[in-house]
């Protein structure tokens, strides 16, 4: 009603020729003002307060249906949209969530879940979690704030705690209220305490477990910790029997009498159950005794005197430079004597070498020289070293000389061999005629 009268009177801060407060608001201005007021009220409405207890499991579901109306174009009444939506959660002013708070969302078409066990250090301190929703189809965003006010529990922590490993569950399935309620009901039938609370839920992947194969509907597994105010029942104590411990060491299932109460919906690995009795644990906490904050008196400060004694570094110089230099000089002289004064020389080597070896070496050098000269000029006569010395049939000595008008450099090899004097004739095969033995 006040808003209606304010709109009729106009803007009191507007100035016209007739005075102040006589200007009417246009419909566009009115619409903008109403949209601003609606935005402010919707932002206040988006901040949600929750009051979990320290040491008790906290679960908050981020429903996609709740955020669908935040993205334009706004759906009409009765219209159903199935846009993919993901969430990003962080502590206000920080890039990540608190250490005790976890978040999981399997697919953009499923709801997100915030879960964890608040600690006693945050009791009385409001924890503001920024929740940003992303519409993956329209790329629109919406941001809400979740204010977590952690309350102190009556009995924290509960003295008796048991951790179960459920093999046929994923963490988001176990966080459902009806599933978690069924599990706590089964534990209560076995344990029969007066108070029973779920303390924490952890995925097996966070404990180093393997990702299951996508066959036979395999699950990751979940660790569920519960606490009670009475001692463990005899059924839970059966895991500590030597027979069951032996079966667990052999990778066999232990025999537990109360397993049938869980087997309907929950497959528990009894070898991984953990029983913790807080009443028998010795506290290692030592109270810190704070002093006055004054350091003990160490006496009067005495700085070093201005007149320092002179120090001679000549000996240090000799040890550091002179000694290595002298050793290097001696080694250099020894090396020079070996390289320069201990050489045999060519004459001494020839005197110690036999004559036959020298002649053989000299003939090899001469032949090598002739071959090199041939490669430079191929129009010269054959070298003497390639001519035959003895006739292969008669054994006569043939002088290794050529006639002056004999030139075989341009003659084929076979023809040159046939024209040589004293050359043995090679018999030619007969093409016609008879053959007689």
UniProtKB/Swiss-Prot annotation:
Lineage top rank: taxon: Eukaryota
Post-translation changes: N-glycosylated. Ubiquitinated, leading to its degradation by the proteasome.
Tissue: Identified in all tissues tested. Expression highest in lung and placenta, moderate in brain, heart and skeletal muscle, low in kidney and liver. Also detected in embryo.
Topology class, membrane: Single-pass membrane protein
Keyword Glycoprotein: yes
Cytoplasmic compartment segments: 339-437
Recorded family membership: Belongs to the sarcoglycan alpha/epsilon family.
UniProt name for this protein: Epsilon-sarcoglycan
Organism of provenance: Mus musculus (Mouse)
UniProt lineage: Eukaryota, Metazoa, Chordata, Craniata, Vertebrata
């Amino acid at each position: 009603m006040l808003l209606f009268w304010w709109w009729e009177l106009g803007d009191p801060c507007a100035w016209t020729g007739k005075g102040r407060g006589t200007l009417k608001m246009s419909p566009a201005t009115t619409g903008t003002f109403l949209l601003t007021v609606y935005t402010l009220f919707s932002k206040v409405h988006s901040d949600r307060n929750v009051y979990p207890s320290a040491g008790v499991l906290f679960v908050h579901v981020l429903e996609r249906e709740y955020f669908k109306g935040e993205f334009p174009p706004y759906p009409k009444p009765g219209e159903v949209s199935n846009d993919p939506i993901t969430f990003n959660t962080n502590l206000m002013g920080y890039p990540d969530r608190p250490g005790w708070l976890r978040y999981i969302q399997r697919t953009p078409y499923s709801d997100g879940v915030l879960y964890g066990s608040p600690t006693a250090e945050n009791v009385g301190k409001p924890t503001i979690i920024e929740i940003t929703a992303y519409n993956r189809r329209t790329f629109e965003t919406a941001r809400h704030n979740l204010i977590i006010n952690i309350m102190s529990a009556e009995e924290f922590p509960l003295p008796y705690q048991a951790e179960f490993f459920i093999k046929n569950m994923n963490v988001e399935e176990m966080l459902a209220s009806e599933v978690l309620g069924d599990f706590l009901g089964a534990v209560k039938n076995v344990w029969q305490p007066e108070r029973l609370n779920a303390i924490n839920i952890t995925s097996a992947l966070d404990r180093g477990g393997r990702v299951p194969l996508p066959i036979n509907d395999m699950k990751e597994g979940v660790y569920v910790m519960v606490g009670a105010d009475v001692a463990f029942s005899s059924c839970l104590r059966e895991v500590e029997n030597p027979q069951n411990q032996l079966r667990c060491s052999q990778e066999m299932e232990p025999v537990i009498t109360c397993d049938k109460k869980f087997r309907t919906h929950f497959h528990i690995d009894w070898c991984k159950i953990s029983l913790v009795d807080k009443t028998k644990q010795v506290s290692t906490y030592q109270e810190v005794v704070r002093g006055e904050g004054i350091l003990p008196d160490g006496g009067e400060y005495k700085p070093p005197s201005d007149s320092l004694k002179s120090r001679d570094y000549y000996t240090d110089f000799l040890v550091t430079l002179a000694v290595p230099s002298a050793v290097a000089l001696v080694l250099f002289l020894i090396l020079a004597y070996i390289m320069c004064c201990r050489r045999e020389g060519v004459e001494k080597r020839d005197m110690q070498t036999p004559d036959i070896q020298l002649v053989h070496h000299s003939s090899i050098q001469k032949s090598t020289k002739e071959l090199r000269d041939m490669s430079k000029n191929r129009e010269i006569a054959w070298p003497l070293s390639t001519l035959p010395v003895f006739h292969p049939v008669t054994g006569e000595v043939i002088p290794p000389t050529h006639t002056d008008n004999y030139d075989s450099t341009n003659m084929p090899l076979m023809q040159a061999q046939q024209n040589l004097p004293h050359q043995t004739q090679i018999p030619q095969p007969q093409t016609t005629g008879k053959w007689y033995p």
